[in-house]
Amino acid sequence: MTMLETLDLGRRLSRPEYDRDLLRYQVQLRELAWQLYRRKRSLVAVFEGRDAAGKGGNIRRLTEKLDPRGYEVFPIAAPEGEDQTHHYLWRFWRRLLPPDEKQIMIFDRSWYGRVLVERVEGFCTEDAWKRAYREINDFERQLVDAGAMVVKFWLQISPEEQLKRFEKRQDTAYKRWKLTPEDWRNREKWGRYDEAVEDMLLRTSTLTAPWTVVESNFKWFGRVKCLKTVVEAVSKALDYKPADPVIETQARKPGGKAGKPGKKTGGKPHA
């Protein structure tokens, strides 16, 4: 059984749990973003996943309470123009180095296109995508050596859930633009993409830049898991524990009791 097959895609949160945890981690991330600025550190967050897996929704919740001067989101599509004349990592280096005033840089799709869509669709040679695992690991190692933290998310949904989301997009006028013929064609290659994803997770999850696999059939659960993972990764890297706004609010209430928030460490790709 593969890693993706072992995921429990039924994991979910109730509305009160979602509202509570979303507030908690958004406020904590805002505090941590200020610490990144003070310490001249940066965070690189990568979101990959199936079409309609929720990358954009996760990124919106991640940035919702951040100072817009301190982050930038890079939506990545197929290379065009000058980008096509260089090594595939060139266009990403241009965005990341030299560091500017942005503490948080977020990629909606990324350099992993080389070992995902380019591999499956035959846009590069087999030698090229096999070589890319080492190139990507070296690339991310250089980012870490330059003072960045790297967090990477694979958002996993089932074929059935993806179909539901496609049909909803098709039936909703203001969402219809998101659905393309290519999205439907990609569904026919689900197994080949699964194989590429498994190889990617196995070969590019490192101690310094681990993958987090996010069960995303239920959007509320996936959003909170991503936010929590980012907060814990930055908190650990900075050795700084942000205040918990939920506990502080409870403590201010008559008879309220303040508890201690749990803490989770990073590691290899996990669910």
Predicted feature locations:
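Glycine-rich phosphate-binding loop of ATP-dependent small-molecule kinases
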Residues: 1-271
